[in-house]
Amino acid sequence: MKILVYGAGVLGCNLARNLFHAGKDVTLLARGNWAEEIRKNGLRIKDQFSLRTSVSNIPVVPELAPNVRYDVIFVVLRYTQLDSALETLRANQTKNIVFVGNNVQARALAAALPEKNILFAFALSAGHREPDRVVSIDLKKITIGQLRGAVSNAELIGEIFGGTKYKVVYEPNMEDYLLCHAAFVMPAAFACYKTDGDLKKLRRNTVYLGRVIDANIEGYRAIRNAGHDILPKADADFESEKYRKTCLRFFKLMCATSLGKLCASDHAMNAIDEMSALNRDIKRFFDENGAAYPVWQALEAEAGRYLR
């Protein structure tokens, strides 16, 4: 398959590297000094928890020309950058487009490209980019699928990821999956902003972490009451004591180890515009559906000097 990864941040670079190492025909769209670095020295990715640095000589292009056709394009941009890519995608001949990352307006985005086969995905990798390399943790797991009611893309997904090391979770209702993901990550982002990016300040603050969970539950409740599914299904019983205990253990681990910086605060502190837009749009969803979310609003107020 001929694949383009449109965007060369942490997620895009990990995706391109993994597909490339599986023998896929992959091209990476990158620009500026970072593109030149990859051309000269290869795409270098350092695994946070090992001494290993992979080097991948992936072809790089600076733009997507209208007459160049790919079997699939993965658009790996920040939520705030997606609109700027729509005209380019619309003009290109490629039919299969996968938007990877945070998104609470999946249905509207798909409607903006009616001639395309639109999928959405979320990959479990995180980290940061340095001038000459990416430093990250990559769990090689991706959740991917289309909107509920759209034609199944299971066969296409199998073809894309066949032979790779990815654990692929096919999700035929990505709109609800991404709504739920936003309802989980935004309260965690509030915690990052409260601590100026140093989550270790909260490692013993069980009361605050409990409020983070309360805000997540408010978000899930609003999503469920609006007629959407809670996804992944493991979170469906989100009002149970078991769910609270599981979340508390997770957040304590994040705050006590380097996982918090790598998986949460690195991105939150470097993508304030994206987190602000995500917060704005999911609150609009809450308001349109008459939801109450007082704990969410209180945590937001405490993080207010960062959010725009």
Regions found by a protein language model. Name each.
Residues 3, 25-26, 97, 118, ...:
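Hydrophobic anchor at the start of a short beta-strand
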Residues 43-60, 185:
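N-terminal glycine-rich dinucleotide-binding loop that anchors FAD/FMN and/or NAD(P) in oxidoreductases
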Residues 105-183, 187:
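Rossmann-fold dinucleotide-binding core
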Residues 52-135:
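Rossmann-like NAD(P)(H) cofactor-binding subdomain of soluble oxidoreductases
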Residues 175-203, 207-220:
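Active-site-proximal catalytic alpha-helix in oxidoreductases
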Residues 217-220, 224-308:
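NAD(P)-dependent Rossmann-like dehydrogenase/reductase catalytic/cofactor-binding core
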Residues 133-143, 193-203, 258-269:
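Helix-loop-beta segment of a Rossmann-like dinucleotide-binding subdomain
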Residues 1-51:
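NAD(P)+-binding Rossmann beta1-loop-alpha1 motif at the extreme N-terminus of oxidoreductases
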